[in-house]
Regions:
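A detector of single, family-specific signature residues
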Residues: 2-470
Length: 470
């Protein structure tokens, strides 16, 4: 708490003695307060102009805030040549703000060489979408005014390597969706013609294609199936090419290989996580990472009513959440602490909430593994070696005679021993939770309880095999 002498009717030192028992009190001299205010104004004035850009596909609306006034400055064509010309006309002390869009990062890359700083902001932080009057000119002015007032916090800017991985993963996602649509079209033909379920497991494998070719269907249906099969073959080759590039990049990433030591995590999950997060050390704790990924529950509380948890916030990358949930489904089917955690939450809240909680637990586990630079303690070396060898083959490494996954997959005794160790880790986790629940203090009658909490931190000393285990 700080106040200026003369602001109250009581003497400032007496008022400070009365307040210091409740809050921290600092008595500020008027000259010192004036000096701080003048310093902030001089700093803003020396920072140059604040420029807002409302970026469109064909043009950018420009607005400039200077000396407390905001004015429009026309439009600039969204081409590299015109943006370079526009950037060369700016002062090196200027600052530029623009909203996240498809071309925002390329515009920022061109302008950042000419100005002091380029800030790319989230549309949710500007309030432009909720405005009653919305035009390109007003949007640019709003960005310039907020930037001049220092109320804009730019989103994290990924490096070029991270952007390339994001684009490749997005390309793969679109190709997989197109392949699924082509397969569904063939299934629709079979349903439409009252054809029973295929007698093979993989309808689009060798036996499945042979079965499709032997069906007696009208000519137009046969043409549809043939066209879809050719389209699927083309998409398979495109997906394989993209996955080869992703695998080559993953082999050069120590972080992706470290995440793949966790059972259930493949290269797509690890690459999607790293592409969405980037530098893990910019998150101070696992909770910040969970909130960034949108896996934290929304909390509702008002008045004397207890706080209640709602659905997850779903902020951040949807593809990263999807990858974590898919990895969680695979992880909970294998013995280990993750399986025990899923079973415990499912018994109370159901499988839907339990699998999302498991995905959240995976995100926390990833944070510990990456910040401590260590592999997962409960990994199964044979499965890890198999995943890494398949990753090398997918990246284009030559195959050798013998099993395609190496000697690890052929030693049944070794794999059985690894599974037994995983089962022991799961039992250790269950004992830890049981001891923690027995030693936890009982809730007082009438105390507010926040539902939706999947787990809490165990007491000190009651750990399983590694503190990074979920």
């Amino acid at each position: 708490m700080g106040f200026e002498p003369g602001s109250f009717r009581w003497p400032p030192l007496r008022l400070a003695r009365l307040c210091r028992e409740h809050v921290s009190v600092v008595v500020v001299s008027p000259l010192l307060l004036q000096w701080f205010t003048q310093s902030e104004e001089d700093e803003v004035r020396s920072a140059g102009r604040a420029i807002g850009l409302d970026v469109h596909r064909d043009f950018c609306e420009v607005a400039i805030a200077q000396d407390g006034e905001v004015r429009s400055a026309g439009r600039v064509d969204t081409t590299p040549e015109q943006l370079e010309l526009f950037g060369s006309s700016l002062d090196p002390r200027d600052r530029v703000a623009l909203e996240v869009s498809g071309s925002a990062w390329e515009v920022a890359r061109i302008l950042e060489r000419h100005v002091a700083r380029v800030i790319v902001v989230s549309p949710a932080d500007t309030g432009i979408r909720q405005a009653r009057a919305k035009t390109d000119r007003l949007d640019a002015r709003t960005l310039a005014r907020l930037l001049a007032a220092g109320e804009l916090d730019g989103v994290w800017s990924p490096d070029e390597r991270c952007r390339v991985m994001r684009r490749r993963l997005s390309r793969r996602e679109q190709l997989v969706r197109s392949r699924s649509r082509a397969k569904n079209e063939i299934h629709a033909v079979l349903v439409r013609r009252l054809v029973g379920r295929p007698p093979v497991t993989d309808l689009f494998g060798v036996k499945g294609r042979r079965w499709l070719s032997e069906l007696e269907l009208p000519l137009e249906e046969i043409e549809t199936i043939g066209a879809c099969l050719r389209h699927i073959e083309f998409l398979d080759s495109e997906i394989a090419a993209v996955e080869r590039q992703i695998a080559s990049e993953a082999l050069r990433s120590a972080e992706i290989r470290r995440l793949m030591t966790v059972p259930g995590v493949n290269v797509i999950c690890a690459a999607s996580f790293m592409a969405a997060v980037g530098e893990i050390r910019r998150f101070q704790n696992p909770r910040a990472l969970v909130a960034y990924l949108g896996l934290d529950p929304r909390v509702y509380q008002s008045g004397s009513a207890p706080a209640t948890g709602g659905h997850i916030s779903k902020q951040g990358s949807a593809s990263a959440r999807w990858a974590l949930v898919e990895a969680a489904w695979s992880a909970v089917r294998q013995p280990g602490p993750q399986h025990a955690f899923y079973q415990r939450v499912r018994a109370r809240r159901g499988h839907g909430i339990a699998i999302v909680a498991s995905a959240r637990k995976l995100a926390c586990l990833f944070w510990f593994l990456l910040t401590r630079e260590e592999d997962y303690a409960h990994q199964q070396p044979s499965l890890t070696a198999k995943k890494l060898r398949l990753l090398e083959i997918r990246a284009g490494a030559p195959t050798v005679k013998g099993t395609p996954t190496g000697v690890w997959a052929t030693r049944q005794a070794m794999r059985a021993g690894e599974r037994k160790l995983a089962e022991q880790a799961e039992a250790s986790y269950k004992r830890m939770v049981s001891d923690w629940q027995a030693a936890a203090p009982k809730k007082k009658a009438g105390a507010s309880v926040t539902p939706g909490r999947a787990s809490q931190k165990p007491s000190t000393g009651k750990v399983a095999r590694q503190t990074t285990s979920p």
